[in-house]
């Protein structure tokens, strides 16, 4: 145990659509850092980023963590965006980002932390950026030989005129069958995703996604179980037990993910041991393919009728809310919340 506590700069909130989820995740992480032996190991210095990108120091950050909702900000306010670190940040020994979506898990803030010369929890710039962009991620998975559902990658510019739009719709319908899913390439938590069953719905879904991100992906829908594996470590990666998500909805959208009672998690997932082993092995392969270390949650589709396993995506800053798989998977693997956040900080220093 260190002679003096390590000061952890816990950064949360952010400009993405997952702002509220980040607050709830951060509150859980802080509980872990302020419990048991961690109270002697760490001093937590929270930093809140508001929806306009302003960085706020300890007083507002602590109040936000206590309420677990975004605060009402006073006026006049400082200019929006990053204007420098809040007072007292020079004492921070290590950064712990609890940020979801753009500017949080896409390599942006990881680059800022790297410039400070201090270690930080989670994946680095490259792994974060590749994992956040679904087009880049899918290319990396393909190069690693990992099976994926059929998909079409495209750019919003292909929707700009009637001729190219029609050609795009024709190409998607030629390569994929309905239903399919239209996704912005760089958003998380199912934000901006739509399930489409016709050409009219496809066109509307593309318009909706293109308003959020110029890079888009359309994926073939499959009738499969949704299973997940958590990964932890830096020099040596460990894979958790496997979990399964079952939900009371047509698909696993944002509301279903974050509304209590709308989804059910089965941990461990009721799967044959050989299938569990394949999932764990492919989760580690996925991390290697995109250059991810620290922590991640890797999501798969499994069709038990033909024993087909497809990798879906990797999340480099998975949620830590009450409904979040990552901490629950590790708890089922024998790692408590207190131990988990400690391990994550240890990996940052390796």
From Swiss-Prot:
Keywords: ATP-binding, Cell shape, Cell wall biogenesis/degradation, Cytoplasm, Ligase, Magnesium, Manganese, Metal-binding, Nucleotide-binding, Peptidoglycan synthesis. One of its GO terms (molecular function) is D-alanine-D-alanine ligase activity. It is found in: Cytoplasm. GO terms for biological process: cell wall organization; peptidoglycan biosynthetic process; regulation of cell shape. GO terms for cellular component: cytosol. It comes from the Bacteria. SUPFAM superfamilies: Glutathione synthetase ATP-binding domain-like, PreATP-grasp domain. ATP binds at residues 173-228. HAMAP family: Dala_Dala_lig. Belongs to the D-alanine--D-alanine ligase family. Cell wall formation. This is D-alanine--D-alanine ligase. It comes from Synechococcus sp. (strain CC9605). The lineage of its organism: Bacteria, Bacillati, Cyanobacteriota, Cyanophyceae, Synechococcales.
């Amino acid at each position: 145990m260190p002679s003096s506590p390590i000061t952890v700069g816990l950064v949360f909130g952010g400009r993405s659509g997952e702002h509220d989820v980040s607050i709830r995740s951060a509150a859980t992480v802080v509980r872990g850092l302020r419990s048991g032996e961690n109270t002697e190991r760490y001093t937590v210095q929270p930093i809140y980023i508001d929806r306009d990108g302003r960085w706020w120091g300890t007083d507002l950050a602590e109040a936000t963590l206590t309420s677990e909702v975004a605060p009402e900000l006073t006026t006049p306010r400082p200019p929006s965006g990053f204007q420098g670190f809040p007072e007292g940040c020079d004492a921070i020994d290590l950064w712990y980002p609890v940020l979801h979506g753009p500017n949080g898990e896409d390599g942006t803030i990881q680059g800022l932390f790297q410039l400070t010369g201090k270690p930080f929890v989670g994946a680095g710039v490259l792994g974060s950026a590749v994992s956040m962009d679904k087009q880049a991620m899918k290319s990396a998975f393909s190069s690693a030989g990992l099976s994926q559902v059929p998909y079409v990658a495209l750019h919003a510019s292909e929707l700009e005129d009637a001729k190219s739009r029609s050609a795009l719709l024709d190409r998607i319908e030629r390569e994929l069958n309905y239903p399919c899913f239209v996704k912005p390439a760089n958003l998380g938590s199912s934000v901006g995703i739509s399930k489409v069953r016709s050409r009219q719905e496809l066109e509307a879904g593309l318009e909706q996604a293109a308003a959020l991100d110029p890079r888009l992906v359309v994926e073939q829908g499959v009738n499969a179980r949704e299973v997940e594996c958590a990964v932890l470590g830096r020099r040596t990666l460990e894979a958790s037990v496997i979990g399964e998500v079952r939900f009371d909805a047509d698909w696993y959208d944002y509301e279903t993910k974050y509304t209590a009672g709308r989804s059910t998690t089965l941990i461990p997932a009721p799967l044959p041991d050989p299938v569990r082993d394949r999932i764990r092995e492919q989760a580690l392969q996925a991390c290697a393919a995109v250059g991810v270390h620290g922590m991640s949650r890797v999501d798969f589709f499994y069709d038990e009728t033909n024993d087909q396993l497809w990798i879906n995506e990797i999340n480099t800053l998975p949620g830590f809310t009450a409904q979040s798989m990552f901490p629950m998977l590790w708890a089922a693997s024998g790692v408590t919340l207190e131990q988990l956040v400690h391990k994550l900080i240890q990996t940052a220093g390796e």
